[in-house]
Amino acid sequence: MSIARTTITSIVNGRRVPPSAQMELRFNAPYDWARVLRFFSGRAIPGVEQVADGVYRRIVDLHGDAGRLTVAKHPRKHCLVATVEGAVARHVDDAFAARVATMFDLGADPAVIGSGLARDPWFAPLVEAAPGLRVPGAWSGFELAVRAIVGQQVSVKAATTIVGRLVERAGERVVHEDDGAPAWRFPTPEALAACDLDKIGMPGKRVAALTGTARAVAAGDVPVDREHADLATLRGAWLDLPGIGPWTVEYIAMRAWRDPDAWPASDLVLMQSIAARDPALDRLATQKRRTEGWRPWRAYAALHLWNEVADRAGGARGG
């Protein structure tokens, strides 16, 4: 997305009212807001994120300040309207707008992506059914990495529950009004590294992987965001961490590093979806060869397949 096309309007309030700011973030139509919300809703971190009444809300923090981010689709314009409330609003600038735009994949060109995938007869009907599908991102690369580690070999619902427990143990409540909206800051790497994760609901090896990753990020031993390293460096650094395998890295690459060609090959839902279309493709190696024709848009291919399953199941599946 071009930041030149982003409108940022500061709203000056009285001293007793927390500062706020509003942004209009343009996208290339069509934009499937309903399915973006469904994806976020099924994975919303308790206390940190919330999807309700067609709106996404979460706690965000930057430079030591925190506040609420609320995002809704404009009823007429091709844009999302993002409102920031609280101390963090003072940091709203082009870089902040770009971060929100990246989280909601506003820079994607659905016409180019759709035409690329629709060359495969598997995807032509999926693209026709959901032409504005996006790859939902994350506010923080570390937050998404935690989500990916916790989500190893468990259901979306189970992972969401466990991440909620992590927030309760290592996060910080930054909004104290009891209004039912998000109020918790996601744990910092330092806080999570120091947290006792006994009886958190994960196997010991996964707990060790999570704690080790938090320590590595806190120490600056591993890059977290694409602005600090290229994709090859990021993948290599994360694959070197104990307990971090290809699925975890590709999931992070898809949603946090914004690699449009990321492919979490061993994802059970994706593997089942491919095998259902061609029973001969029942092995990881043969499936990966089949995906070569989907380059450079395999992350969007994954979302289309997950979305198809979610449409049938009526809930979040995969990722």
What do these predicted regions represent?
Residues 1-319:
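HhH-family (HhH-GPD) DNA N-glycosylase catalytic core used in base-excision repair
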